[in-house]
Amino acid sequence: MKGLSGSRSHHHGVTCDSACDSLSHHSDRKPYLLSPVEHHPADHPYYTQRNSFQAECVGPFSDPLASSTFPRRHYTSQQELKDECALVPRTLATKANRIPANLLDQFERQLPLSRDGYHTLQYKRTAVEHRSDSPGRIRHLVHSVQKLFTKSHSLEGPSKGSVNGGKASPDEAQAARYGKRSKSKERRAEPKARPSTSPGWWSSDDNLDGDMCIYHAPSGVMTMGRCPDRSASQYFLEAYNTISEQAVKASRSNNDVKCSTCANLPVSLDTPLLKKSAWSSTLTVSRAREVYQKASVNMDQAMVKSESCQQERSCQYLQVPQDEWTGYTPRGKDDEIPCRRMRSGSYIKAMGDEDSGDSDTSPKPSPKVAARRESYLKATQPSLTELTTLKISNEHSPKLQIRSHSYLRAVSEVSINRSLDSLDPAGLLTSPKFRSRNESYMRAMSTISQVSEMEVNGQFESVCESVFSELESQAVEALDLPMPGCFRMRSHSYVRAIEKGCSQDDECVSLRSSSPPRTTTTVRTIQSSTVSSCITTYKKTPPPVPPRTTTKPFISITAQSSTESAQDAYMDGQGQRGDIISQSGLSNSTESLDSMKALTAAIEAANAQIHGPASQHMGNNTATVTTTTTIATVTTEDRKKDHFKKNRCLSIGIQVDDAEEPDKTGENKAPSKFQSVGVQVEEEKCFRRFTRSNSVTTAVQADLDFHDNLENSLESIEDNSCPGPMARQFSRDASTSTVSIQGSGNHYHACAADDDFDTDFDPSILPPPDPWIDSITEDPLEAVQRSVCHRDGHWFLKLLQAERDRMEGWCQQMEREERENNLPEDILGKIRTAVGSAQLLMAQKFYQFRELCEENLNPNAHPRPTSQDLAGFWDMLQLSIENISMKFDELHQLKANNWKQMDPLDKKERRAPPPVPKKPAKGPAPLIRERSLESSQRQEARKRLMAAKRAASVRQNSATESAESIEIYIPEAQTRL
C-alpha cells in the first residue's frame, strides 16, 4: 500500500496549497467548498436529471447529526457499505427531497456549513499543518505514486497522455479518470452510496492519517457523501487518479478544480458512488480487486447508460496496455470490458495470452469463451471459419463447446506433431501455435458420447470434413510412400520379424518378396468405442480405379511400439463395403488413445478416405498396407463356407496385392494374396477383452458381418493345406483365434475364449517331456475356444491336469519297466520311491490345489482364494513337481545305461549342473567315452524334463504359448521411429 500512502499525502497536499494557513479558522473553511453558485451539479447537464443528488446535498448541511457522525463512521471494513448507504436514503427522505433544485445554490451559500461536524475533527489539524508546508514534497509523492501505478497492470494505458504529462486539462484528466472507471460506475448501485466520508474507503488502512478526514469533512455535505462539495471529491479523485502535475496545480485553486471536476463527472446513481468509483479505480491491484468484487455485484448499467454513452468514447476504460486486450477495445457503451476482466493484471495478461492455444479446456465465462472461439478459429484452419454448422456458440452445450475445441485441436495438430516425416507443418496448419495435447483427443472422444449423438454427429462430420479437406492433398501425397520412413506404421520391421518364423507356402501361392513393393497406403481411422462415425463419414467422389475381386476381406493390421499404443486400422475392401463399414463404429479397441501416433493415423486415414473408399486406392500398384513379406497366403475356396456363415468373424490381417500384377486381382480365378500377420477371429457371442501389459500392441478388429463376399476369402483360414505356422493357425474352424504381437519384454494377448472352459485341455501347450506321452487329441471346434486367458481357476485346473497326466505317464512307464525287466533291488527301490512320491503328490497336493481352484470358481465360497493365491500355491507345487521330475530323470538315465547302477563319480557328474558337468580327474579312456555317451543321453532326458518343468512358467511369462497362436517378437528399437 505504498502507493496509497503516497497518494494520501498527495491528496492532502493538494488541498493544503490553497488553504493551509487558514485551517484553524472556521470562517476560512469556505474555500474547501465547491462554489455552490458556479459549479453546483445542478448547473451541469449530468446533474439536471438527478434531483436526488441535489436534494442529497441538503441533508448534510441541515442535518447536524449526519455531519457530526462523520468521525464515528470511520468503518474498518467494506462490509459497512450497506449501513453507510442506508444513511443516504434516510436523509433524502427527511429533508433532501423537499428542497427544489433551484434553491440549492442559495441554500448552500446561506448555510453555516455545519461546523459541529468539523469541530469533532479539529484534533487532527496539526498533522495536516505539518504536511501542508512542503508542496514540493507532495509533488514528488504524486510522481512516485504515478510511477507505482504505471508499473501495475491495472493503470496507465500507453495512449493516456493526461496521466504522465500535462497533455490534458484537469477536465480532460478527470473525464479520462471516470471514463476508465465507467464500468465501476455501472458496478455501483444504491447500497454503494458511500458518503464521501472517505474513512469508509480508507477503512482497510489502519495507519491512515486523520488529516484527510479534515479535507473531506470541512463541510457537512462531504459527511453525507454529496458530490457538490467538490473540494473533497476533487482532491480525492485527483490525488488517487494520479493526475498530472498540471492537474495538481490547477487543483490548488479550489474553484477551478471544482469546475473542471464537476463538468466532467458522469453521474451515476449517487455521486458518492462516483467518487468512490474514481477512488477505487486508482487502487492498487489487490485493493482494486476487493472493490471490484464487491462492487460488481451491484452493476446498474441502465442508470448510467446515458452518461457513459455521452462521455468517454475516447477513453480507455481500463488503463491497461491496449495491445494486451485480445480484441476488446473500449466502446463506451454497456458492452465495455466486463467487470470481471478488471480484477487483476494477471487476469488481463492471461486474457492476452489466450491466442497461444495453451488455455485449458475448462469452461470459462462467456467473454473468455468468445475469445477462445476467435483465437481457436484463427489457429486451427482457415476452413473452420467457413463452418456454419459449427458456430460453437452459447446454444450448444458448454461441454460440447469445449470438447469440440479440444477434439478439433487434437485432430488438427496431429499433422505437425510426430506426423509423417514428409508432411510440412506450415503447409498443413496456418498457425504454429498448437501444443501437443495428448489427452485432448482422449477427453474429447471419451466424453463426446455423453452428449447426444444427434448433436455431435452433424457437427463433427462437417468439422472433420472441413479440417481434413485442407490436409488431404499434402497428407495423401505423403502417403504415397516412395520414401522410406514416411509411413509411421512399423510394417517393415514388423513383417520382417514375422518372416523369420513363418514358412513359405508354394501351394497356396505364397508371395514373399525380398524387396517389398512400396504402395499407396489406404487407411481408415479406428474409432473410439464411445464414438460412432466421427471422422470416417466422407462422401467425396472417389477417383476411378480398377475393379477388385469380391473375395478380398475387410482387413486391418496391428503393430505397436512398446512405448506407444498407436491405434491404426488399415482397411481394404469394396467401395460400398468401405462406406458401410466406415459408419459401423464396430472397430473398437481398448487401447488408449493418448498416443499421437494414433491421431496421426486418424488424420492419415481421414485424408486417404476423403478421396473415396479405402478399397479403391488401387491404382499405381496400390496395396492396402506397405509390407515387406507375405507370411502366408490362403486361396479362396468354398470349403466350410456354411460353417463360416454361421460364425460371424472379426479378422485382422494384411492384404497385399502383388506389385508386379496389380490387375491380376480383378480375376476371380486368380487367388487373393494375403500377408497374414495374425487373424483375430471372434464369435459374435464372445465378449473378450483385449488384455495387455505395457501398451505394446493393439489389435484392431474390422467388421465382416455385412459382407458375404468376404466369406470365400476368409474361409480359407480353415484351409489345412497351408504349411508351417499358418497351417497350424488355420487348422481349425476359425470362429476364434488369438493374435499376439509382442514388443521387447512386453506381452500382449487377445483372449478370445468363452467364459465356460468346459472343453478338453490339450497338453500340447505343455510340451511333453518324453515321446511316450501321447498328447490328448481335441476336436477342432473345441480348440476354437481354447486360449490362454487370464489365470483363474479354470486355467490352473488345466495346468494341474496336464501335470497329473504327465506324472501318471511316468509312473505307468516305470511300473511297466519294473514288470518287464528283472531289475536289481536298488533300482526297484528307486522306481518305487519315484512312483510313490508322484502318486502321493497327486493324491495330496494336487487334490488340495484342485479344491482351491474349485473354490476360486465358486463365487459363494467364503474364503474364496484369488488368482494370485492360486498362482502362489502353484509355484510352491512346482518345487515338489521338480523334485519328482529329478527322480524320474535319474530313472531315465539308469534305463539309458541298461539299468546299471552308476558309480559315485557318475552320480556326482549327474548331480552337477548341466552347463558345467564335473569330469572325473582319473579314469580309463573307455570309461570316459562311455560316460560321455551316457552324459549326452542324460542331457537329452534332462532337456525333455526341463521343457516340461518350464511349461507353466513359460506360459505365465508369455500369454501366447498356445499352439493356436502366433507370437511375434518385435524389438523395441525397430518399432520406435
UniProtKB/Swiss-Prot annotation:
Region feature Interaction with DYL2, mapped onto this chain: 650-661, 672-683
Residues recorded as bearing Phosphothreonine in the entry: 563, 590
UniProt modified residues of type Phosphoserine: 169, 356, 359, 362, 366, 383, 412, 415, 419, 422, 431, 503, 510, 562, 565, 589, 592, 595, 932
Region (Disordered): 150-203, 349-371, 899-965
Function in brief: Part of the postsynaptic scaffold in neuronal cells.
Oligomeric form and interacting partners: Interacts with guanylate kinase-like domain of DLG1, DLG2, DLG3, DLG4 and AIP1. Interacts with the PDZ domain of SHANK1, SHANK2 and SHANK3. Found in a complex with DLG4 and SHANK1, SHANK2 or SHANK3. Found in a complex with DLG4 and BEGAIN. Interacts with DYL2 and LRFN1. Interacts with MPP2 (via the SH3-Guanylate kinase-like sub-module).
The species this protein was found in: Homo sapiens (Human)
Primary location class: membrane
Keyword flag Cell inner membrane: no
Molecular function GO terms recorded: molecular adaptor activity; protein-containing complex binding
Protein's recorded name: Disks large-associated protein 1
Chain intervals with Basic and acidic residues compositional bias: 903-912, 928-943
Keyword Metal-binding applies: no
Swiss-Prot/TrEMBL keywords: Cell membrane, Membrane, Phosphoprotein, Synapse, Ubl conjugation
GO biological processes: chemical synaptic transmission; modulation of chemical synaptic transmission
Post-translational modification: Ubiquitinated by TRIM3; leading to proteasomal degradation.
Membrane-spanning ranges: none
GO cellular component: a single term: glutamatergic synapse
Membrane topology recorded in Swiss-Prot or TrEMBL: Peripheral membrane protein
Motif (PDZ-binding) on chain: 975-977
